[in-house]
Structures are given as C-alpha cells and as structure tokens.
Amino acid sequence: MKRYIEICKPLWTLLPEGTIHEDERLCKHTYTQMGGAADLFITPQSYEETQTVLKFAHEHRVPVTLLGNGSNVIVKDGGIRGITLSLKKLNTITCTGVELVAQTGATIIEASRRARDAELTGLEFACGIPGTVGGAFYMNAGAYGGQIADVLESVLVLTEQGEFKTLSKEEFDFDYRKSVFSAKRYIALEGTFRLQKGDMAQIQAKMDELTIARETKQPLEYPSCGSVFKRPPGMFAGKLIQDSGLQGTRIGGAEVSKKHAGFIVNVDNATATEYMSLVRHVQQTVKDKFGVELETEVITIGEDIEEPVSD
C-alpha cells in the first residue's frame, strides 16, 4: 500500500491542493456502503489534470482504477492499490439544438432531467439509473426498454497513455451491459447524445411513470448495487432466484431482497466478502435447481483482505 503512495509523491506538486486523498475509505463512495480503502483517491477538476494523472501513472507503472458513482460496483474489503480516479467534479451538462453534451462525472439522472428541461426526448429511460454518465457508457446502461446505445453519438476519451481521442458511435461496440469502454482502458471524459425534440409534459409523464415503477418494485430503502445479475436469454434472473426460494436468505449483513429477488441488499453493515459469498450462493443454488448459470452485472474491483500468516 505505502509503495504506491511513495511513488506518487511528485503528483502532489502537479495537482491542486485537496485533489489527492490518502487511504480514502471507499465505503463512503459506493451505494452498498462497503469496501476497503484506496491507496490514493484522486478527484481532478479538469481534463488536463486527468491527463496529468494518467501520464504519470503510465510512466511510473501505477495501476489506475476508475470509480464512478459506485452504484454498480463492489469494492472488496482489502481496498484498491495504486490510484483510484473519481471524475465526479467533471459534471457539466449543456444542450444545443437536439444535442446534449455531458461530462462523465455528471449523473445520468441529471442528464435525463436536463434533456427534459430542454424539451428533448430519448433519455427518459435513464431518469432512475443511479450512476454517472461515464458509468452508463461503460455498462451500456439501460432500463425499461431504453439503453445508452440508442442515443449516444460520440465520446471524448483519454487513452491509458494519456492521449485525447474522440470515438464515434461506430466504435462503441455496445452489447448487453458491455462496451468498448469496458473492453479497453479508455477514460471517458464527455459524451454527446443525439436526442429528438419532444413535448415537456409528455416527457415528464413518462419519467413519472418509470419512477413509480421503480419505487414500487425495487428495495430502495436499503443500500444495494441494483440488479446483481444479467438477464439470461429468455428468462428473468429475479424470477429464477425467487423460484429457488432464496428471498430473505442472508449471509452476515447481506440479504437477498424480499421485495425484488434480483437485488442483494446491505441490511446490517455487510462486508464485501459477505456480499460476494451470498452472490456465489445464489449462483450455485440457481444452477443446481434450473441448470442456469447467472452472470453478474455488478463489477467487482479491489483486493481481498490478506489473511494473517500463522506460525
């Protein structure tokens, strides 16, 4: 842990005061309220500062982990080595004509609201997705029949080497909860959405309808990372879990939601180890009962806690 902190000491002179935080507890930055500490938690306020971090990390071989809103991520209890990069201070959103340009630290919910205010339709599906714009690119986020792939036109990125590059929609390689951003180590900075002119009242009515559906069906009263598993072809993960009799099953403070079986919630100070143990238990139970292998939608990052070596 201390090795990377020492290697990165020169970064303190390259970035504004307050940008770098040592041993930052990541449970403060995830929806599940779990996870160990980051060696270095860096929050750049400009594209140039982000570029400085990436170039330094590449030159000194320091690993970089991007953390968005922490809504679809499990950070392991041992934390994250090297640099954890948060772009939440890059959160500007502008609308011109039928285009909406959003920096990737903005929330996709706020992007949806800004589109509504500009009487632009196409982002209503995102009105309840609790992630950043960048996280939405990474996962090709979607809900209620809509997805990012339908409306994203271009994205400005930084490569792993710290070079700026603009990707067009033909390069996104979107699939179900996959994209070029997850396949390659691009750091997305801003995206341009091409939307359509609409009626504000109709847009708001659609957003209200989706919000009610979400609040009715999802266990929003507990910390969680949303839907844990991808939808198997022709099936629903939640239905398979429910039919396996797993609702209410607990390991430590983690529980399969009684309200929606596709969610695993933190009901009592769960650790990431407990959470992932329950995920594996659900996967094995569903496989044994139905022969279906559930694939996780949630992303797991970081390291496990090292067990002490006994004499």
Curated annotation (Swiss-Prot):
UniProt function note: Cell wall formation.
GO MF annotation terms: FAD binding; UDP-N-acetylmuramate dehydrogenase activity
Cofactor requirement: FAD
Cellular component aspect of the GO annotation: cytosol
EC number of the protein: 1.3.1.98
Protein's cellular compartments: Cytoplasm
Domain FAD-binding PCMH-type per the UniProt entry, residue ranges: 34-198
Pathway: Cell wall biogenesis; peptidoglycan biosynthesis
Keyword Calcium on entry: no
Origin superkingdom: Bacteria
Main location: cytoplasm
Alphabetical UniProt keywords: Cell cycle, Cell division, Cell shape, Cell wall biogenesis/degradation, Cytoplasm, FAD, Flavoprotein, NADP, Oxidoreductase, Peptidoglycan synthesis
Designated name of the protein: UDP-N-acetylenolpyruvoylglucosamine reductase
Family: Belongs to the MurB family.
One Pfam family in the UniProt entry: MurB_C
Active site, UniProt feature: 177, 227, 297
Chemical reaction(s) catalysed: UDP-N-acetyl-alpha-D-muramate + NADP(+) = UDP-N-acetyl-3-O-(1-carboxyvinyl)-alpha-D-glucosamine + NADPH + H(+)
Record flagged with keyword Flavoprotein: yes
